[in-house]
Amino acid sequence: MTRIDVIDNHGQFTHLEQRALRDMGVDVSLRDNTTPPEEIDADGIVLSGGPDMDDIGNCPEYLDLDVPVLGICLGMQLIADELGGRVGGGEYGGYADVTVDILDDDDPLLGSLYPETRVWASHADEVKEVPPGFERTATSDVCGVEAMSNTDEAIYGVQWHPEVAHTEEGEEVFENFLSVCDQQSVARQ
């Protein structure tokens, strides 16, 4: 069975990320972002959202664990920041029901949602420039980089919240991430 660790960056929806995966039958644990990297033993990691880029604990070190990573909201921003992208304030802050245009129908995480999906967004900051090796895989009228992927490293990010009921195809995002984790697990054996 696929094992996923959800890393708690103290976001308002983190418990919903854990619950969504648990309800899908996944062996999932919620781990504080101060957990030492050597204690992480999972087939994949979800970096949760959170309120503060200055309170990301050991998240940068988790990016080196050679397992697939899905960053959600702040989780995506910290991936971009740590790996050479650029994060800044968004022009539109707050909560919103947003139509997101999926740019790559072959993307392992979001391709199945092509050409667009409705999502729930809740953020003030956003990725302004993706890191080297990443592709922008989704955009919207309110955020230029709604998602990004580095398929070679199996590191993905979405600016919105797939764990929230208002996101129409959120469970599919998690299902696609689980598929990536399963494929990577087989490849490592």
From Swiss-Prot:
List keywords of the entry alphabetically. ATP-binding, Glutamine amidotransferase, GMP biosynthesis, Ligase, Nucleotide-binding, Purine biosynthesis
For this protein, the record's Pfam families field holds: GATase (PF00117)
Question: What EC class is this?
Answer: ligase
Q: What is its EC number?
A: 6.3.5.2
Q: Which InterPro entries match?
A: Class_I_gatase-like (IPR029062), GATASE (IPR017926), GMP_synth_GATase (IPR004739), GMP_synthase_A (IPR023686)
Give the reaction(s) catalysed. Answer: XMP + L-glutamine + ATP + H2O = GMP + L-glutamate + AMP + diphosphate + 2 H(+)
Active-site annotation: C73 (nucleophile), H161, E163
Q: Could you list the residue ranges forming a coiled coil in this record?
A: none
Q: Name one GO cellular component term.
A: cytosol
NCBIfam families, alphabetized: guaA_Nterm, PRK00758.1
**Subunit note:** Heterodimer composed of a glutamine amidotransferase subunit (A) and a GMP-binding subunit (B).
Protein name as catalogued:
GMP synthase [glutamine-hydrolyzing] subunit A
Species of the source: Haloarcula marismortui (strain ATCC 43049 / DSM 3752 / JCM 8966 / VKM B-1809) (Halobacterium marismortui)
UniProt lineage: Archaea, Methanobacteriati, Methanobacteriota, Stenosarchaea group, Halobacteria
